[in-house]
Structures are given as structure tokens and as C-alpha cells.
Amino acid sequence: MGPLIFIDTSVFVAILASEADRAEFEVEIETAARRLTSSIVRLETAMVLASKLDMLPSAAEGQFEKFLMTADVEEIAIDKTIARRAVECFEKFGRGRHAARLNFADCLSYACAKAHDANLLYKGDDFNLTDVNAN
């Protein structure tokens, strides 16, 4: 079994929108010891999929929910500790402050991964400019 992972919005979008790199993310998820995501990722995934696939946000959320259940992904809450880590993340790596240019949801994904000592599974070039452990 692989490591504990926190799954970012970008990965859910890649999988649920059937992007070219979908399979590699599915393998990472399947081989993880434990899989986490957050309620903020739920919202952002529904928003991005609804726009990208021209569907209702509730339908996009339904696809997300089905995937969480199928892949045994645990949804965690954002508490005060995670929120404070997200503020620290923005101060260090946020848009207009650092080359990583992390946005609101990115900062929360970073904070969740750090709070749970999880590797962050993501797509793109932003998180690799931070100090978060990544898959």
C-alpha cells in the first residue's frame, strides 16, 4: 500500500472529465493506504465540472459523490487549525506573493495535506513550488 494522500480538485476534475492523464491519477488513488479530500474540494470540483462539462452543479456533485464512495475517499471538515494553516500558506505561497500563486482552494488543500501529514495528489505546476509533500 502507498502513502496517505489528500486529493486536490485538479485530480477529481481530471478523472471525472476523462482527461488524458486520468488513468495515472486513478492508479495513485487506488494504491494509496488512505484517501482524503475536503468539503471545499467538493464545492470547487462541482463548480469546475459544471462549467467544463456544461452540466448542473448538482449533477457534477453527484458524480463527485459517487466517485468518493467508489474509491473510498474520506471527506474531512475544515476546522480552525486547518484554516489557520491555510492563512499561513497564503502568506507564504499565495497569488501575488509567490511563484506558486495558490488560490483560496489551493491554500486549503495544502493546509489539509499538511494537517494530516498526507501527500498531496494534484495536477499542475503550482504545488511543486511549495514545501508540501506531493505524489
Please identify what each model-predicted range represents.
Residues 1-41, 51-66:
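Short, well-structured N-terminal submotif of metal-dependent ribonuclease cores
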Residues 2-4, 110-135:
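Acidic, PIN/NYN-like endoribonuclease modules and their adjacent C-terminal/linker elements
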